[in-house]
């Protein structure tokens, strides 16, 4: 690198430091003093279910006053308690109301009633990366790199706030109208200084240290980034099998095979992300995220332009206007039932 290029790199890294310091101030204000009860169920018209999960559903809703569409996550308090997800759910809301980044879905309102918790988020009409990836088969390397760059910046932001995301997968990445990513589902996100021990995540994306019940840190997110980049560029994940236990055996073995069409730069980056040895895994070394940002596979990436959303997206989802749900699957609709008695008031008092 010439002197001029090195100086430019240096000043960019300095301004990132300043940006993150300011971002942390903003985050901590909201983290220490979370917004509560900022809307009510009656203010929304429920339109259609966009997705379902073990303790709730996400629905497209329309804010009757403004006419704006949102995605409303509805969680059944009793089911959350039964599935021992109280802490995760409180984390999710507390984190979402405090973060602010171009590639994180925005929490617009949150509230609760006798039966449910509600998180009302920006509606991202392009649907999940998962469905586009399955339809197209695999993404070209430039296409995969465009998305990967956004995740790198997002993790750099989250990790600077001591947040681990822990649930990276194509199902949790929505594509917005400009073709950029919105990361959704902070159900497993956690504020951690040092290490944590919870077993959570999706089998194919789990880092070896989680499987081996070791204490782990934010390096698990960089491992998951390796899995995601591989899956985007190959069309299938690096470790897969019929049973989770077989997947886990492959993950901890430290062996990965690459499709012949992968470029040598891509293979090199993935070997450094899918690195079982934590002392060698990119993102976890003394240069932190810069080992990834300065890697040859990202040589053409203009990180600032990505952050400013100035780079032309490789793919814009088809979109027929506000409230269009054609990029989401259909689900059976169900009434939202609200009890006349309060359920689990104590457990969710801080929500």
Curated annotation (Swiss-Prot):
It is found in: Cytoplasm; Cell membrane; Membrane; Nucleus. The lineage of its organism: Eukaryota, Metazoa, Chordata, Craniata, Vertebrata. Its main location: cytoplasm. GO terms for biological process: cellular response to heat; negative regulation of TORC1 signaling. The active site is at 167 (proton acceptor). Signal peptide: none annotated. Allosterically activated by various compounds, including ATP. Activated by cAMP; the nucleotide acts as a dynamic and allosteric activator by coupling the two lobes of apo PKA, enhancing the enzyme dynamics synchronously and priming it for catalysis. Residues 44-298 form the Protein kinase domain. It is an enzyme of class 2 (transferase). Belongs to the protein kinase superfamily. AGC Ser/Thr protein kinase family. cAMP subfamily. Phosphorylates a large number of substrates in the cytoplasm and the nucleus. Phosphorylates CDC25B, ABL1, NFKB1, CLDN3, PSMC5/RPT6, PJA2, RYR2, RORA, SOX9 and VASP. Regulates the abundance of compartmentalized pools of its regulatory subunits through phosphorylation of PJA2 which binds and ubiquitinates these subunits, leading to their subsequent proteolysis. RORA is activated by phosphorylation. Required for glucose-mediated adipogenic differentiation increase and osteogenic differentiation inhibition from osteoblasts. Involved in chondrogenesis by mediating phosphorylation of SOX9. It comes from the Eukaryota. The modification Phosphotyrosine is found at residue 331. The modification Phosphoserine is found at residues 11, 140, 339. Residues 299-351 form the AGC-kinase C-terminal domain. ATP binds at residues 50-58, 73, 122-128, 169-172. This is cAMP-dependent protein kinase catalytic subunit alpha. SUPFAM superfamilies: Protein kinase-like (PK-like). PANTHER family: CAMP-DEPENDENT PROTEIN KINASE CATALYTIC SUBUNIT ALPHA, CYCLIC NUCLEOTIDE-DEPENDENT PROTEIN KINASE. The modification Phosphothreonine is found at residues 49, 196, 198. It is a lipid-anchor. GO terms for molecular function: ATP binding; cAMP-dependent protein kinase activity; protein kinase A regulatory subunit binding; protein serine kinase activity; protein serine/threonine kinase activity. A number of inactive tetrameric holoenzymes are produced by the combination of homo- or heterodimers of the different regulatory subunits associated with two catalytic subunits. cAMP causes the dissociation of the inactive holoenzyme into a dimer of regulatory subunits bound to four cAMP and two free monomeric catalytic subunits. The cAMP-dependent protein kinase catalytic subunit binds PJA2. Both isoforms 1 and 2 forms activate cAMP-sensitive PKAI and PKAII holoenzymes by interacting with regulatory subunit (R) of PKA, PRKAR1A/PKR1 and PRKAR2A/PKR2, respectively. Pfam families: Pkinase. It catalyses: L-seryl-[protein] + ATP = O-phospho-L-seryl-[protein] + ADP + H(+); L-threonyl-[protein] + ATP = O-phospho-L-threonyl-[protein] + ADP + H(+).
């Amino acid at each position: 690198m010439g002197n001029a290029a090195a100086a430019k790199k240096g000043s960019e890294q300095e301004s990132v430091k300043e940006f993150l310091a300011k971002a942390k101030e903003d985050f901590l204000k909201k983290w220490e003093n979370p917004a509560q009860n900022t809307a009510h169920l009656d203010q929304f018209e429920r339109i259609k279910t966009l997705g379902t999960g073990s303790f709730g559903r996400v629905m497209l809703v329309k804010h009757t006053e403004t006419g704006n569409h949102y995605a409303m996550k509805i969680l059944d308090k009793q089911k959350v308690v039964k599935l021992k997800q109280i802490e995760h759910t409180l984390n999710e809301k507390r984190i979402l109301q405090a973060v602010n980044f171009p590639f994180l879905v925005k929490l617009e309102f949150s509230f609760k009633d006798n039966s449910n918790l509600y998180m009302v988020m920006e509606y991202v009409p392009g649907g999940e990366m998962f469905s586009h990836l399955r339809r197209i088969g695999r993404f070209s390397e430039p296409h995969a790199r465009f998305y990967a760059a956004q995740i790198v910046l997002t993790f750099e932001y989250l990790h600077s706030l001591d947040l681990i995301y822990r649930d990276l997968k194509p199902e949790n990445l929505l594509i917005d109208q400009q073709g950029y990513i919105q990361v959704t589902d902070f159900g497993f996100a956690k504020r951690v200084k040092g290490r944590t021990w919870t077993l959570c995540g999706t089998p194919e994306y789990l880092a070896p240290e989680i499987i081996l019940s070791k204490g782990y840190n934010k390096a698990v997110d960089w491992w998951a980034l390796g899995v995601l980049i591989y899956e985007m560029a190959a069309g299938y994940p690096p470790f897969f099998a019929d049973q989770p236990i077989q997947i886990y055996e492959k993950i901890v073995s430290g062996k990965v095979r690459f499709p012949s069409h992968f470029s040598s730069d891509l293979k090199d980056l993935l070997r450094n992300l899918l690195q079982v040895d934590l002392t060698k895994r990119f993102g976890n070394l003394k240069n932190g995220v810069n080992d990834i940002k300065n890697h040859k596979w990202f040589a053409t990436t203009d990180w600032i332009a990505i952050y400013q959303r100035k780079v032309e997206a490789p793919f814009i989802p088809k979109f027929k206007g506000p409230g269009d749900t054609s990029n989401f699957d259909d689900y059976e609709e169900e009434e939202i039932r609200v009890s006349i008695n309060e359920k689990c008031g104590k457990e969710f008092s801080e929500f």
